[in-house]
UniProtKB/Swiss-Prot annotation:
Family classification: Belongs to the small heat shock protein (HSP20) family.
SUPFAM superfamilies: HSP20-like chaperones (SSF49764)
Native organism taxonomy: Eukaryota, Metazoa, Chordata, Craniata, Vertebrata
Residues with PTM N-acetylmethionine: 1
Biological process (GO), any one: protein homooligomerization
GO MF, one annotated term: identical protein binding
Binding site residues for Zn(2+) 2: 107
Glycosylation sites noted in the Swiss-Prot or TrEMBL record: 162
Source species of the chain: Gallus gallus (Chicken)
Keywords, ordered alphabetically: Acetylation, Cytoplasm, Eye lens protein, Glycoprotein, Metal-binding, Nucleus, Zinc
Gene: CRYAA
Protein name per Swiss-Prot or TrEMBL: Alpha-crystallin A chain
Amino acid sequence: MDITIQHPWFKRALGPLIPSRLFDQFFGEGLLEYDLLPLFSSTISPYYRQSLFRSVLESGISEVRSDRDKFTIMLDVKHFSPEDLSVKIIDDFVEIHGKHSERQDDHGYISREFHRRYRLPANVDQSAITCSLSSDGMLTFSGPKVPSNMDPSHSERPIPVSREEKPTSAPSS
């Protein structure tokens, strides 16, 4: 895979006009100087990109693991309470929906909503699936796998989200 390395002084013509952070997971959390004036801030410090660094570390990335005996989804939903989350299994898919109404924060008013959909492996026992939300905002959805000779049932059913008082340890790769 070829990666183009380009000095910040030679950005494409429309680069400064394209917003960098306005439509990511941090929408509504306040803007940095770079977000409002990307050309100006890059001339002051062409290598300073806090918003890019922050978005990599705190982007709400989900992790899906399918081990030999277990299927797990870990999703950062720190801005949502269990009441704001809906987790359903519909046939071979897990649908996770989060929505909270408009509320006031440090920067004004914010409302958030997301939808995630994941395909379940065919050998996951849907009747034994659990879902929990840790105190640090990690939603963990997991279910055991059954031997391939058993046929797991497929239907729609909601999965309750329980709250855990301990933070989830960082997922290891």
